[in-house]
Amino acid sequence: TIDDFNFKCCIGKNGISKKKREGDKKTPAGTFEIENLYYRPDRIKKPPTKLKCIKIKKNMGWCNDIRFPKKYNKLIKIEKNIKYEKLNRKDYKYDLLIPIKYNSKKPIIGLGSCIFIHLTKDYKPTAGCVALKEKDFLIMLKLIKKSTKIKIF
């Protein structure tokens, strides 16, 4: 809910948890800051928003590799030997993407990574993210700013 808008969304396949762990398919419970908007300029024009907008490039990933503590749960340039979530996906889900600042300031290895607000068409459960239909995502973008927080409960 933002102002008077209620948005239907989908969450992690295994529900919401205060004890989120890497790969558990749970959405973390709590109140979190949000990051910048990442978008696919080859598919969507830059949407109106007060968030900083970053174009997704082919070499962009989000590190989920517990072997690399300095890169874990951060935006990275894709490297061969590092596990990552590719931002430039073949499907539509990351055409619009906002990272949720969960386990991000001083990431604890294994506590979970790659928690995003992204797109869905069918409300199928996610691997731990929050997903909205594109029309709702675009409305949300007009209402939020850098100081907006997401409450997951």
Predicted regions and their residues:
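Cell wall/extracellular polymer interaction/catalysis modules
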Residues: T1-A127, E134-F153
